[in-house]
Design a protein with these regions (language model features):
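Beta-loop motif signature
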Residues: 23, 35-57, 101-129
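Boundary regions of SH3-family modules and the immediately adjacent low-complexity/disordered segments
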Residues: 1-28, 75-101, 140-163
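SH3/SH3-like beta-barrel superfamily modules
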Residues: 3, 54-84, 119-148
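Catalytic nucleophile-His microenvironment captured as a short glycine-rich beta-strand/loop
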Residues: 230-237
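Short, well-ordered loop/turn sites that connect or cap secondary structure elements
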Residues: 55, 121, 219-220, 226-227
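Surface-exposed beta-loop interaction hotspot
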Residues: 103-105, 109-115, 119, 123-172
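Single conserved hydrophobic/aromatic residue that forms the stacking wall/gate
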Residues: 239-246
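Catalytic cysteine-centered active-site loop
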Residues: 172-222
Length: 246
């Protein structure tokens, strides 16, 4: 049986206990839940390999192994599997009730734009707001951010063409999903996830996932996706919008 290693937690020596009846391995592991506590957590197919993707703040993952500062995980949001530095994860649990709708929001130590900054969170990050004071929201175990940068986690029906314009001039980063660097399929995934639509990570997965094929170019509509080898773009009105510069 052939599995896609990008989304299947099976290695030569170890596998998720969920696959015990399917594959034979030396060791089977019951996953432990963790949450990303950094602005993003890079994910690699192997330690030292090129970047595969990134998990954003607040996203949950299943941890199958933690060793020498690395964790072998599977994202619960898109099922991607890989190695990430353990320092980016926490076993603390959250109940996300909001998400970041702006390209980037700054985190402050107090509800004051003149306050000390602690970092940032990117579009599509998931947060638990525990208090609102004036124009600011307090994110659990993190700090304050402008409330205008957040929407309720169940909010949807956003125009992803308009949202994609926030990324204009964002650097291209292979495997990126963060606002500091992103690739084409990462952007498309973020735009669908912000509308609470499950969406796979890579272009080949996305092309299979999108079932309605447009036969003629004249039939393309705003918001349609166009695929070619290794790339994806979205149609903006009558023009093709390339998400990032490669």
């Amino acid at each position: 049986m052939i599995f896609d290693s990008r989304i299947t937690p099976i290695r030569r020596d170890l596998a998720s206990a969920a696959y015990k009846a399917i594959v034979k391995r030396k060791k089977y592991v019951n996953a432990k839940l963790a949450t990303v506590k950094s602005a993003f957590s890079p994910l690699y197919s192997n330690k030292g390999s090129k970047l595969s993707t990134q998990l954003l703040y607040g996203e949950e993952c299943d941890v199958f192994e933690t060793k020498n500062g690395w964790s072998w995980i599977q994202s619960r949001r898109d099922n991607y599997v890989g190695y990430t530095p353990s320092i980016h994860l926490t076993r603390k649990t959250y109940k996300p009730n909001s998400k970041v709708i702006s390209l980037r929001t700054v985190i402050y130590t107090k509800p004051d734009i003149k306050g000390v900054t602690k970092g940032y969170l990117s579009f599509n990050s998931l947060v638990e707001v525990i208090k609102i004071k004036g124009k600011y929201s307090l994110i659990k175990n993190l700090g304050w951010c402008p409330s205008l940068d957040l929407v309720k986690v169940k909010s949807s029906k956003f125009n992803h063409i308009d949202l994609s314009k926030q990324y204009l001039d964002t650097p291209y980063l292979w495997g990126g999903r963060d606002s500091m660097g992103i690739d084409c399929s990462g952007l498309i995934q973020n735009l669908h996830q912000i509308n609470n639509r499950p969406f796979p990570r890579d272009t080949d997965m996305q092309e299979i996932f999108v079932t309605n094929e447009v036969k003629y170019e004249k039939d393309l509509k705003a918001g349609d996706l166009v695929f070619w080898k290794g790339h994806v773009a979205t149609v903006s009105y009558t023009h093709l919008t390339l998400p990032t510069k490669a």
